[in-house]
Design a protein with these regions (language model features):
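Extreme N-terminal starter segment of soluble prokaryotic enzymes
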Residues: 1-3
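Conserved beta-strand-loop-alpha-helix junction that forms the acyl-donor binding cleft
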Residues: 111-121, 137-141
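Acetyl-CoA-dependent GNAT
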Residues: 8-11, 15-85, 97-99, 103, ...
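A contiguous pocket-lining binding segment that forms or flanks enzyme active sites
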Residues: 99, 107-113
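Alpha-helix-centered segments that form part of catalytic cores
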Residues: 150-162
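Short, P/G- and charge-enriched loop/turn segments at secondary-structure junctions
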Residues: 41-43, 145-152
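Acidic/polar short surface loop at catalytic or gating sites that assists cofactor/ion binding
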Residues: 126-148
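Conserved glycine-rich acetyl-CoA-binding loop
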Residues: 62, 81-98, 115-121, 126
């Protein structure tokens, strides 16, 4: 497994990975999420230019999982982590998250997620994230949640989560907030 920055010509592959990864939502009664359009190419390109776009690549150097993130209120906010189902359950999502934290410059990692989907909030809790109380939600995260609600994601319980930049158990892994 190798993690590297996504290239511009690979952006269409990220959309394919997200489509494939989203199919599992159909199986738990959330077909609207499975059918949701992945980010358009210009928006994905913005993460290359202004944020972070990482991929786990296979032996042929083709992305099989990806993570996009951007700075939000002093933390690196994970907008999306997707793993192609053919490569699921191999620790690729966790590896991308841990790699992001090691890039430096961020005091914490944040994300928003579905509270009751097994591979969402419960998974991220195992990766060291903790739910944020209402008073801990920063202005930038509030704006992200507002946009998610406008997109219809609030049909299911969602929450904001945060962890320190280092993996749980690593020296200095505690979340400073």
């Amino acid at each position: 497994m190798r993690i590297r920055t996504v290239t511009r010509d690979e952006l269409p592959l990220l959309r394919e990975i997200e489509w494939a990864a989203g199919e599992c939502f159909r199986e738990i009664g959330m077909p609207e999420i499975a059918d949701d359009e992945p980010l358009p190419l210009p928006e994905l390109a913005r993460y290359l230019d202004e944020g972070t776009a990482l991929a786990v690549v296979d032996a042929a150097d083709r992305p099989v999982a990806y993570l996009i993130a951007e700075p939000v209120d002093g933390a690196l906010h994970i907008e999306q982590v997707s793993v192609h189902p053919d490569h699921a359950r191999r620790g690729l999502g966790r590896a991308l998250i841990d790699h992001l934290g090691q890039l430096g410059g961020a005091t914490a990692l944040t994300l928003t997620t579905f509270a009751e989907v097994p591979w969402n909030a419960p998974y991220y809790a195992r990766c060291g994230f903790r739910p944020l109380a209402a008073e801990e939600i920063t202005p930038g995260l509030r704006e992200i949640r507002r946009q998610e609600a406008a997109h219809g994601l609030d049909r299911w319980p969602r929450l904001c989560m945060r962890r320190g930049p280092r993996p749980p158990g690593a020296p200095g892994a505690d979340d400073p907030a």
